[in-house]
C-alpha cells in the first residue's frame, strides 16, 4: 500500500486529532458549503482551457475544452462526487479544467439533482438523461460519438456506472470506456475496505452512509440500482483506491 501524500497525511492527522467529526452532524447547507470550501485543496486553476456553462433540455452542463480545439473531440462526460447530497461545478471546476488540458479531451460535466431535496432515482435519471442529451447534441458540442467516456468520482462514479448499464440495457449506444474514481458502489458499507478504512481517512464510513440514507430513504435493497455488488464494465479504469473505503469493488 502506498504512503499518503504529505499534505493529505497532515489533513488526516488533523482530522483524527479533532475527534473524527462526521458530516452527519452538519446541516445540509453547512455540509455543502464545506465541500465548496475544500476546493482550495485542488491547487491552482488551469487557465489554458475554454469554459462554457450551458443549459440543454432543462439540464445544466459545464463544457471545458482545450484552447483552440476544432472539430469533434474525444469527450469525457463527468459526474461530480459529493455523496449524492453536495457538489457541483464549484467543487470540481479545477479538476475538470485539468482533465481537459492534460487529456486533450472535451470534458462535459452534468449537474444532477441532489438529496435530500430529490431522492432516488433523481440523480441517476439526470445522469442518464444528461448523457443522452450530450449525444443528441454531439455535432454542435463538438463531441466525437465514437469516443465518449463516462467518468465520475465517489457518487459520480456510481452514476457513471449505472448510466452505462442503463444504456447497455436500452441497446441504444455505449460509451467507449468508464473511468471510476473511488466510486461509491456499496450502499450497505459492508465491504472489507469500508471496515479497514472507514474511520481515519476524513471521508468516513458514516459520512458515506449518511449520504446514502438521504438519497435512498425509501429504496428497497433488492432494487437492481441499489448498488451493493455489481459487475464492473469490461473497459473500466479505477483510480485512487489505496486508502479508500470503496477499494473492495475495483
Where are these regions (language model features)?
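Short beta-strand immediately N-terminal to the catalytic nucleophile in serine-hydrolase-like folds
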Residues: 150-152, 181
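Short beta-strand-to-loop junctions in surface cap/lid or active-site-entrance loops
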Residues: 60-72, 229-234
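Short beta-strand element of the alpha/beta-hydrolase
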Residues: 72-83
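A glycine/proline-hinged amphipathic helix-loop "lid/cap" segment
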Residues: 1-66, 222
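Gly/Ala-rich beta-loop-alpha elbow adjacent to hydrolase catalytic centers
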Residues: 152, 156, 160
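Alpha/beta hydrolase fold serine-hydrolase catalytic domain that processes acyl esters and thioesters
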Residues: 145, 161-250
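Short amphipathic alpha-helix adjacent to the substrate-entry channel of hydrolases
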Residues: 90-110, 125
Amino acid at each position: 500500500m502506498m504512503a499518503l501524500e504529505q499534505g493529505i497525511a497532515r489533513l488526516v492527522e488533523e482530522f483524527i486529532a479533532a475527534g473524527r467529526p462526521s458530516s452527519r452532524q452538519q446541516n445540509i447547507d453547512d455540509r455543502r458549503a464545506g465541500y465548496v470550501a475544500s476546493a482550495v485543496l485542488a491547487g491552482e486553476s488551469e487557465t489554458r482551457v475554454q469554459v462554457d456553462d450551458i443549459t440543454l433540455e432543462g439540464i445544466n452542463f459545464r463544457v471545458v475544452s482545450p484552447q483552440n480545439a476544432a472539430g469533434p473531440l474525444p469527450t469525457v462526460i463527468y459526474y461530480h462526487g459529493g455523496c449524492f447530497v453536495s457538489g457541483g461545478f464549484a467543487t470540481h471546476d479545477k479538476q475538470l479544467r485539468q482533465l481537459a488540458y492534460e487529456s486533450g479531451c472535451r470534458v462535459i460535466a452534468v449537474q444532477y439533482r441532489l438529496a435530500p431535496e430529490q431522492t432516488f432515482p433523481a440523480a441517476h435519471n439526470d445522469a442518464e438523461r444528461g448523457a443522452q442529451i450530450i449525444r443528441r447534441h454531439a455535432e454542435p458540442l463538438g463531441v466525437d460519438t465514437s469516443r465518449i467516456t463516462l467518468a465520475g468520482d465517489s457518487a459520480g462514479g456510481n452514476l457513471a456506472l449505472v448510466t452505462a448499464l442503463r444504456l447497455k440495457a436500452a441497446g441504444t449506444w455505449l460509451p467507449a470506456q468508464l473511468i471510476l474514481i473511488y466510486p461509491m458502489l456499496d450502499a450497505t458499507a459492508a465491504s472489507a475496505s469500508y471496515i479497514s478504512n472507514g474511520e481515519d481517512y476524513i471521508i468516513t464510513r458514516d459520512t458515506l452512509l449518511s449520504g446514502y440514507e438521504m438519497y435512498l430513504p425509501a429504496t428497497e435493497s433488492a432494487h437492481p440500482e441499489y448498488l451493493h455488488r455489481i459487475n464492473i464494465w469490461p473497459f473500466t479504469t479505477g483510480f485512487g483506491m489505496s486508502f479508500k473505503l470503496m477499494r473492495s469493488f475495483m
